[in-house]
Amino acid sequence: MTSELVVDVQPKEVSIALLEDKNLVEFQQEGRSASFAVGNIYLGRIKKLMPGLNACFVDVGYERDAFLHYLDLGPQFHSYQKYLKQVLSDRKKLYPISKATSLPDIDKEGSISNVLQTGQEVMVQIVKEPISTKGPRLTCELSFAGRYLVLMPFNLSLIHI
């Protein structure tokens, strides 16, 4: 069986078709609004640390900075950051995530200022869309949802199909 993914990007919408043996299996259309939807993944930059809240604000390109709490960094934050640094150092080379090493978990009672610094780049995923005057809410525990499984890199403790 051969699978083919066809993506058509137009000024007002994006269409995606999944073909298996030249037969349409799945079709999706989305408007090209610049909305920040739940599940979107961005490379953000730390704008401001808030030690009193144990959180920080991250610039992901939205008009308001997004909010990232220390507990939303996830236990494998150091592993994510090491892998991200590797990828960003040489963007032309492929770094399979299967070859990435797992580092010790971050301290559950730790402080945001001990882990992050202003200007640092972090890979984040939106968990709550922006509302009113507030920007989006973020997490560093990335998850990729598929039809039969949810992939969470560096998280091998739970595997369900």
Label for each model-derived stretch:
Residues 1-159:
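Single-stranded RNA-binding surfaces
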